Amino acid sequence: TYYGKVRQIIDSNKKYPLLSRQRKEEGAPKVIFTILKNGVVTNLSIISSGHRSLDREARRMILISSPFPKIPDSVNESSISLTIPINFRLKNN
């Protein structure tokens, strides 16, 4: 699906912030944005995780992922609005 491709691109650009790792910060900021028909992102906002570095990384992930692939013609919309949680979880060792 188009959503699956978008999610895969976003996830491929994820880097757990070093400072957050050191502080053992976890969270799930939500990114809210619109993808225009040509794949360009607009109206990007963040619902905070409570940790500034995680929120900044979530924003960076969207910006570096843009532009996304064009919205397929089969999707009869000029834009798609998405809300996606970005989960930052440290693995237990």
Region spans (language model):
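Short amphipathic alpha-helical segments
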Residues: 1-2, 50, 54
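Intrinsic-disorder/low-complexity signature in envelope-associated proteins
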Residues: 1-7, 34, 40
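Solvent-exposed, polar/charged alpha-helical surfaces in well-ordered, non-transmembrane soluble domains
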Residues: 4, 8-12, 56, 60-63
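Short, positively biased Gly/Pro-containing turn/loop motifs at secondary-structure boundaries
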Residues: 15-23, 59-93
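Long, acidic/polar E/Q/S-rich protein-interaction regions used at subunit-assembly interfaces
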Residues: 18, 42-43, 47, 56-57
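Short tight loops/turns at secondary-structure junctions
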Residues: 23-50, 62-65
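An alpha-helix initiation/capping motif
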Residues: 4, 25-29, 80
